[in-house]
Every structure is written in structure tokens, then in C-alpha cells.
A protein has these predicted regions:
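Phosphate-binding P-loop
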Residues: 1-3
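Hydrophobic anchor at the beta1->P-loop junction of P-loop NTPases
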Residues: 8
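The conserved Walker
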Residues: 12
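Conserved glycine(s) of the Walker
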Residues: 15
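Hydrophobic positions on the alpha1 helix immediately C-terminal to the Walker A/P-loop
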Residues: 19, 23
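N-terminal phosphate/diphosphate-binding loop that engages ATP/GTP or pyrophosphate donors
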Residues: 25-76
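Internal catalytic-core helix/loop-beta-alpha segment
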Residues: 72-106, 110
Length: 172
């Protein structure tokens, strides 16, 4: 039986990252070694000013993109490709030891990096459970790779977390 593949998608600010974080927390509570990448928002004075990038296993954090950074731009944000590549490599260095992989997110900013693109392709070929948050605009590329959960701001994160864990047979 192939390893479970879960794709989470939805509009910006719909709760995709909250769901990924909820799944990570629950999996860790069940004793699973979770590895991957998270990209939480940077909020200053109630405004989103950028995104961090975190290697889940080591908890090492860098700035992925910011309004006042340097690098290629996606919307108002400038993407730091060097930091993105660094965290992507850090994750890839210990992917084999993971029980479950979580990637948040596969989106426009992240796909500017060749190293990230290669990683995003590779994780769907290894025999480990994968949970990936995928930007809606990228869904055509990833639609056949796993069970898709489309969420919105009305979605019940707790119930969806339970359903995904059950579908992955990790609800015990």
C-alpha cells in the first residue's frame, strides 16, 4: 500500500497553514517524527510584512520573504532565495529519518528556487506519508498526487485534522 499523500489547498488566509500546524502538533503527540518546512506569516502592527521559513526538525528559522527585502518579487514581497535554499537543503538532509513529511507551502515564492522545485518533486516519490499545502494556482500540477482537501475560512480545522489523521491511519 503506497504511503498516504494529502494535499491541502484553499484561498489565501483560509487556514491552510493553521491546518498544517494542527496536523504537525497531533502527529508529534502520537510520537511521530515530523520533518518538513513551514512558512508562517510575519505580522507587524497588524499588517503582514512577510513570511518566515522554518525547518520543522531543527526549528531553525530564516526570513523567506519580506516587503523590505531583496530578491525576486512576488506581489509586494521580495523572496530571499539564499535562505529558502538553505532551509530546503537542511530539510532534505534529514528527510529519510522522518515518519511524516509536511510542506507548507508549495507556492509561487517557494517555486522561484530550483532547489525547492526539485525537493517538491522528490517528496512525492519517496515512500513516506506527505502532507503538502499547495497554492490554488499550482493545483493543476499536483492534483493527481494525493487526496485533496480544499478549505476555506469556515472550515473546522479540528474536524479536518481528525479526518486527515483517520485517512492516513494515524488516528490511534
Amino acid at each position: 500500500m503506497p504511503a498516504p499523500r494529502i494535499i491541502i489547498t484553499g484561498k489565501p488566509r483560509s487556514g491552510k497553514s493553521t491546518l498544517a500546524l494542527s496536523l504537525m502538533t497531533e502527529l508529534r503527540l502520537k510520537g511521530k517524527w515530523v520533518s518538513g518546512i513551514l512558512t508562517p506569516e510575519i505580522i507587524k502592527k497588524k499588517e503582514r510584512t512577510g513570511f518566515r521559513i522554518i525547518d520543522i526538525a531543527s526549528d531553525e528559522t530564516k526570513v523567506l520573504a519580506s516587503v523590505d527585502g531583496k530578491g525576486p518579487s512576488v506581489g509586494k514581497y521580495h523572496v530571499d532565495l539564499q535562505e529558502l535554499d538553505y532551509i530546503t537543503q537542511k530539510f532534505m538532509d534529514h528527510v529519510e529519518s522522518a515518519d511524516v513529511i509536511i510542506i507548507d507551502e508549495i507556492g509561487k515564492m517557494e517555486m522561484l528556487s530550483e532547489k525547492f522545485r526539485n525537493m517538491a518533486e522528490k517528496i512525492f516519490t519517496i515512500e513516506k506519508p506527505v502532507i503538502a499545502v499547495v497554492n490554488m494556482e499550482m493545483m493543476k500540477q499536483y492534483s493527481g498526487t494525493g487526496d485533496v482537501f480544499t478549505i476555506d475560512e469556515k472550515s473546522n480545522i479540528e474536524k479536518i485534522t481528525e479526518k486527515i489523521l483517520k485517512d492516513m491511519k494515524m488516528d490511534d
